[in-house]
UniProtKB/Swiss-Prot annotation:
Belongs to the SRY family. This is Sex-determining region Y protein. It comes from Apodemus flavicollis. Gene3D superfamilies: High mobility group box domain. Residues 1-57 bind DNA. InterPro entries: HMG_box_dom, HMG_box_dom_sf, SRY-related_HMG-box_TF-like. Transcriptional regulator that controls a genetic switch in male development. It is necessary and sufficient for initiating male sex determination by directing the development of supporting cell precursors (pre-Sertoli cells) as Sertoli rather than granulosa cells. Involved in different aspects of gene regulation including promoter activation or repression. Binds to the DNA consensus sequence 5'-[AT]AACAA[AT]-3'. SRY HMG box recognizes DNA by partial intercalation in the minor groove and promotes DNA bending. Also involved in pre-mRNA splicing.
Length: 57
């Protein structure tokens, strides 16, 4: 099952790759790390709730 970071990063990874086609996967992962750390607790809370919902499916 996907955790909250995975739920969020799925769409974000796609966007980053489309916006920066020459960016390597390691660079994308680093950008995702920075982006995740910049999310507010409220933003993360909804992602944790979505991850929990997906676990029950």
């Amino acid at each position: 099952p996907m955790n909250a970071f995975m739920v969020w990063s799925c769409g974000e990874r796609r966007k980053l790759a489309q916006q920066n086609p020459s960016m390597q996967n390691t660079q994308i992962s680093k950008q995702l790390e920075y982006g995740w750390k910049s999310l507010t607790e409220a933003e993360k809370r909804t992602l944790f709730q979505e991850a929990q919902r997906l676990k029950t499916l």
